[in-house]
Amino acid sequence: MTHRNALLAIHLGALMFGLSGVLGKLAESSPLTISFGRALFAVLALLIASYLLQPSGARPNWRSRLGLLMGGLLLGGHWVTFFIAVKVAGVGIATLGFASFPAFTVLLEGLLFRERTRPIEYGLVLLVCVGLGLVTPGFDLASEATVGLLWAVLSGFLFALLALLNRAVTRGIDAVQAALWQNLAILIALAPFAWVGVAGMPALDWLWIGMLGVFCTGLAHSLFVASLRVLKARTTSVIFALEPVYGIAFAWLLFAEQPTLRMLAGGTLIILATIASSRLKSTPAPAAEPARSVS
């Protein structure tokens, strides 16, 4: 893959990840059912990808698989809470609330890995908090915007935990295999609760959820992994910071969810903090990139 093709691939992957909220809103099913269906189609897509793509690392051993299954539970929780936010507050607020996860990552790295947090990183956390304050018109638990934002922030917190767990358990492991095991964990964990919803799922929902699993998870993740073989991790991180931009743009076009000036200002602060956070990572870990399975 050439450098130009890798850039196209990573932008296409970010675009697909940005469509997750849009497809989740189009589907009439519950967030639990949507997440189960997404995992089902993602497992099928990742199985195909594992045969077509050259492995980027080793196959996970049983100890690693246990960690990946735990990561799958976090990923499943992240998906469910994200789609709840989409249903309650809309795609824009849900996407921007989730985009707060770098702030949680900064704080949790200091607590869990005892890494020194620099003053500028605390500044980025403050920037995200100000951005979140601007995204919602006012903090009122009777407001759907506020409730949806809280669900989205919880989704971002769970994703931050997932990112840190992946950092510990995916060293040297093929990224597609890691994503496959995590989606398999979601499939198994949600099956007892989502089966009734799947049985009564509207026919059109199969299309939206199938696209979520195949394109916004399986294919998007495969493009991400393939591009990492050519691009620097920092470059891909900055490009993936555009995910909320794509999500808000599609929601505006398809659902007339026109963002307010406050929301645009808050979103700009959150995205800037995300980009700055990725640029501040001084030394990349000497391991394979962790599985990237975003909303």
Regions found by a protein language model. Name each.
Residues 7, 94-100, 165-185, 217-253:
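Helix-helix packing/entry segments at the starts of transmembrane helices
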Residues 49-53, 101-123, 245-265:
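C-terminal transmembrane-helix exit sites in multi-pass transporters
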Residues 46, 50, 69, 75, ...:
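Hydrophobic transmembrane alpha-helices of multi-pass small-molecule transport proteins
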Residues 29-77, 102-105, 127, 157-165, ...:
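Transmembrane alpha-helices of multi-pass small-molecule transport proteins
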Residues 39, 137, 205, 215, ...:
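C-terminal-most transmembrane helix of multi-pass membrane proteins
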Residues 33-44, 83-114, 155, 234-252:
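Specific alpha-helical transmembrane segments that line the substrate/conduction pathway
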Residues 1-12, 43-70, 113-122, 140-147, ...:
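Membrane-interface interhelical linkers
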Residues 1-40, 73, 81, 141-168, ...:
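Glycine-/small-residue-enriched transmembrane alpha-helix faces in small-molecule transporters
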